[in-house]
Amino acid sequence: LIANSAIRHDWKWVIYSSENRTASVKMQLMQFAMDKKVADMTYAERKQAYKWVQGHFTIINNNQIYSYSDIILFMEKVMRQQPVDAIFVDPYNSLKLDMKGSGIGVHDYHYEAASEFLTFSKANDVAVWLNMHAVTEAQRRKGPDGLPVAPYAEDTEGGGKFVNRADCFMTIHRKVQAMDHDIRKLSELHVRKVREVETGGSPTPLEDPYCLQMNLSHTGFTNRLGQRAMFKPITFKESTQMPINMSFLS
């Protein structure tokens, strides 16, 4: 979805992923953009894809653990140097709790964090996307097939406060232990909340989410029937060396 917005709308992103190395995030973005494994790219393609990633994404190093206020401060510094359309925090649950001298509890701290992110988003016209884990109880819930079902919005760690503050809320669910290989490749996209439905968006039916199917190379997604890709991969013109004019020697 992040690569989709960058390719279709030229969005510029700031990404903090505490569970993935910076190089790994960049490599995955390169592969999604090109719809090709890095190992299958030519040197010129790798160079151009890396340049494209550098131009669209600022990746925050995960050598340190940051609080939500650290992320906002970093965003403000980046925005003074370049335009930013969105930030992705993966996951919010990994951010450290910085409650020294605040005199508030954990519940109020997280509500304050959600409010601060919302205020920052509105004030700067920047989309703030927080990736969050579900509570343990939701992970135990099984469907008729014996596999975990998609958690509800209120199953998010921290409860309904994040649902209440968010403009949009989505749940992405995969059945990675399904016996059917095709089902393993599916990602269910449940739109749980859309605040402004007047602009055209709306929640998905409870039992009828959008379904995206990962391709065989794990470098892109199509619709459930595999008929249409989410976006066309970017292409670069191979640079060719100009022929050397040796006529002056004759």
Q: What name fits each language-model region?
A:
Residues 1-8:
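Walker A/P-loop NTP-binding motif
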Residues 19, 59, 90, 117, ...:
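Conserved RecA-like P-loop NTPase ATPase core
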Residues 9-107, 112:
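Conserved inter-motif catalytic segment of the P-loop NTP-binding fold
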Residues 15, 88-89, 126-133:
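Structural recognition of the conserved hydrophobic beta-strand(s) that form the central parallel beta-sheet
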Residues 107-115, 152-155:
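Charged helix-capping and loop-helix junction motifs
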Residues 94, 133-136:
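Signature of the SF2 helicase/ATPase Hel1-core->accessory helical subdomain module
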Residues 68-85, 101, 119-124, 137-250:
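C-terminal regions of RecA-like/P-loop NTPase motor modules
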Residues 3, 115-118:
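Short, hydrophobic alpha-helix immediately C-terminal to the catalytic nucleophile
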